[in-house]
Amino acid sequence: MEQVTKNVYAETKVRGCNPVYVVTSAGVVIIDTPQLPTYAVRMRKEAESHGQIKYLINTEHHVDHIFGNYYFRGAGIVVAHAETAANFKVVTPEINPYEYA
């Protein structure tokens, strides 16, 4: 992760989504998660080194934004549009996660 401002860190060298975490006085906010397991595990470890993860925000339903959520289980409240899960299931009803990892 690259530090882009004092409290904002982003994954800038991956194709697709650029996951971010923001360090606040109340805790850490994750914005989207990496789809690759190794990146997701590393992001969580780095983010937690700055404090407790309070929120995980998913900006959309595409796999490059949400697949890493699995590696953030129990790490704060997940925030997303009400249709995110429904859209994911409609667009990719029989997705093979190994095609994206």
Predicted regions and their residues:
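Active-site HxH/HxHxD metal-binding segment of metal-dependent hydrolases
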Residues: 45-101
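Conserved beta-strand hairpin/beta-sheet module of binuclear metal-dependent hydrolase folds
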Residues: 2-48
